[in-house]
């Protein structure tokens, strides 16, 4: 899962030294965490190294050395996280002679992009929108895959709201900011943005059905809060930006460009292993349970396996319902990048000097193209 924090940072910059110092400290803490609290490649498998790859390509991947995967948010069972955990546990990385270490991210995309650019992480989950913002701010990373132009950000309302313009003049809750895709959806639907009262809420979605402090709508993630509310017996309407042709992304991945240039086969095969694991984890309820169990083992006793199973099944359904046009699973849609730039310009999140042509060069399908044949991931590797 990719938590889009960079938009908030862009819209609410500050030069106060105390905040800058705290931000630097937070980045340092995550960087320190990258030296420990991780799991090495193929921890739970008996597969033999190189069993799914030629000797020549195996040597190339071994020469790449240690590869650090940094998740978007802890070991949550989201697309872009669970399949990497499963690829490790099922031995797929080992099968391809890859030395992959998994690291849990904090949920702060801005930190992930900096760690990726500095080489402290090799590959990481970074939403397409966040990658554009990072590159616009001089952070050098490259987008290498995405599962869908749909996104995770949604707006929830109680059942008495049947059309979004009914929210005019009402209270809308958020977790620090209203995601650009949600605002774009609301404005496209005819909501008078300046009429809204925007309030920061915590992470308890029950404030919506309780209409706490007059709350009529609440932002969230399609795979999280709606499932929590449903489990509690609360029925809400979920408004998804993709239904209004608003751009976003799910499961997007980025790489350190210097590593990718030096070790292209390793980048290809990291994606190959992850996509092979994605297919495994999505194949049946039993295999989904198996994969979520791997994440639970890494996370500890407090891991909510039931909720995380719902997270995976919800996100993979959104991906299946909204395949990337003219692309295999993992392929990036250049037109979606153009639409994202337009949206970021609309809300002054990136400078007008950042063009769609600029942004398209920050993404590549070369690695996905290299591992795909007739729309399917090639396994084993050549």
Regions found by a protein language model. Give the residues of each.
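Secondary-structure end/capping motifs
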Residues: 263-351
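Short helix-capping segments at alpha-helix termini
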Residues: 91-95, 189-193, 233, 300, ...
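C-terminal motif of bacterial Sec signal peptides marking the signal peptidase cleavage site
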Residues: 32-36
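Bacterial signal peptide processing site
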Residues: 38-40
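Bacterial N-terminal signal peptides that target proteins for export
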Residues: 3-25
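Conserved C-terminal helix/tail region of periplasmic/extracytoplasmic solute-binding proteins
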Residues: 337-382
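Pocket-lining segment of extracytoplasmic ligand-binding domains
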Residues: 204-206, 211-304
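Short, glycine-/small- and polar/acidic-enriched structural segments
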Residues: 44-202, 206-212, 216, 220, ...
